[in-house]
Amino acid sequence: MEINDLTHTIIGCAYKVHKVLGFGFIEKCYENALKIEMDKLGIHALQQDKVNVWYEEHLVGFFVPDLWLPEKLIIEVKSVQNIPREHEVMLVNYLTATKIDDGLLINFGPSVQVKRKFREYKPKGSLIDALVR
């Protein structure tokens, strides 16, 4: 599945989860429900899988993404009033560490909030996009 279709489908899953569960559960409930919805559609993500962080040739630590499709997409799930900026920065760092280009930050707050993040800046409607078309 192409990445834009994949992210669109996962966002649809998030809205379904929010419609059923509403707001107020802990993050893990939404993460588990999102994984179930994704699995139903044949989108099989790794959940809470440890990923090593390297500095040059040295292992310096690890992080644990909520859900991820290796080499395709990292999904971070939150259950807060609004998405804090530091969570956006953290997702971009995860993308950089894994060399994955795309990430979704999904907040199951009073309403669903979705932020799509990229490892590298991708301006919308740039001159290059216009020339390629």
Where on the chain are the PLM-derived regions?
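Nucleic-acid nuclease catalytic cores
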Residues: K78-G125, D129-A130
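Solvent-exposed, charged helical/coil patches
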Residues: M1-H44, V112-Q113, F118-R133
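A short acidic/basic microdomain associated with nuclease active sites
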Residues: D39-E57
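Accessory recognition modules or surfaces
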Residues: E2-T9, E57-L69
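Conserved catalytic cores of phosphodiester-cleaving nucleases, focusing on short active-site segments
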Residues: G22, A45, P65-Q81, Y94
